[in-house]
Amino acid sequence: MKKHSKKILAVFAMVLALACVLTACAPAAASSGNTGSKASEAPASSKADEKPVTLKYIDYGAKPDSGNCDGIWKAVNEILLRDLNCTMDVEYLGSGDASQMALKYAGNEEFDFAYMARWWGFADNAQNNAFRALTMDELKQYAPYMVENLPDIAWQQASVNGQIFMLPNIIFEYNEGIVAYRGDLLEKYEMEKLKTMDDLDRFMETVAKNETGMEVLSADFVGELWVNYPYHLKGTTWAYDYTDADHPEMVCIAMADCYLPYAKKMREYYEKGIFSAELISDTTNGRDRFKNGLCAVTAHNSTTISNIALEVQKSHPEWKIEIFNPYMGNKVVLGAFTGNGFVVTRTSQNPTKVIEVVNHIYDSADLQKLLNFGVEGVDYEMKDGKMTMIADVPADKKMNIGCNWNMSNNLIKETFIEEERYEGYSEIRADFEKNTVSHPLQAFTFDKTAVETEVANMTAVEKEYNAIRYGLLEDVDTAVAEYRAALKSAGYDKVKAEYDRQVKEFMATYNK
């Protein structure tokens, strides 16, 4: 019996060996260096016998003229070639001009994918057939990590007219504005720390009366602080009340009841010297003005303000920067997942490979480190699994690939980095998380096709009356009345009716 068993085993071994020869058994795939999630495994389409694919990518803005840009992309391509048998050929648009990017799509230029954002013409380009629509079946097959980790609202926000067109960023962030101000001036005038908008007004009036050679307030996020947040409005020109999910409606802020009090407040700021007459034409953004000591107060989203405060703390510790949220306890909504993302172009010859690449950018710790922080040993060091940034990296070796806003995944980054936040930020963030609500219109995208002329006319009117935002018009009541009349003449009623129609249709199919 034992002899027969040995013969059988010998024959079986020969069969296995022959099978391996005939099928050219390949060795196991190399490690991808990712987080180890099964979602990060390369899909079946990435086979060893495929020819390597080069994917053309268009990035926002100009290519950096300093730093290790080419070196970073070379390292990225080594990982992509190893894991997905492809590389990226990165072209920088050269500017942040959305119309320049739209021309590339309109001209049928062949490239595979590109940076995109909801504020950078996403909906318009999608409606103009610039992008390839993505199906959920494709996403489940080629982007399993993204499907697993993004909420349904992200894919709804990435959709236009019921079709998914964007691969959204995996960032759970808030866009609500908070305030940074000069703590040294607060001490100088023996004032208590600021907690409310009234406190902020008193501080700014004091600075305006007593400080020379310094503007008080930059124009960034002024509308948000004095209109959007107190009235729970999400949006810029058109917005919705995000605390009232039972009555979804898009309203034109300039036509809303809150606009006249806001306009009068801006005039008050101008008359009290909080706004200068030159502010309307100043091309320096408020963040840089604050960092350079040109203004005493600035506002922006919470993450940006924290980073500004950290930077100024190092460059000017004597300014004793303070940050605060004047609307602690207010309801908030998460920032759009489509604030930054990727789109697959209509002309792409390798759409599913693009989806794989974007999924891998998000699921790989190696790629997250490269694309957001640079090269280990040059830009940062790892100790006990945590990242520490290296100071004084030579300019030619420093991490700098320009726009990488769409390449960050908070879920992965949190596993190896503890991001430094300014004092007070954690309490503000915790308050946001405690008071987060959702609203159906977070996923609504307006199609302006039927009212394109009227929308353009209204935009021209808004620019014409931009001085209201800076308090430059003395008779505010008359100015606002004229502004609203001009909006009416430009086609406001038709645009409003189109918004109402589309919102009604959207709500009829929402979550159906």
Which stretches of residues belong to each language-model region?
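Extracytoplasmic/secretory soluble proteins
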Residues: 2-3, 12-13, 21-512
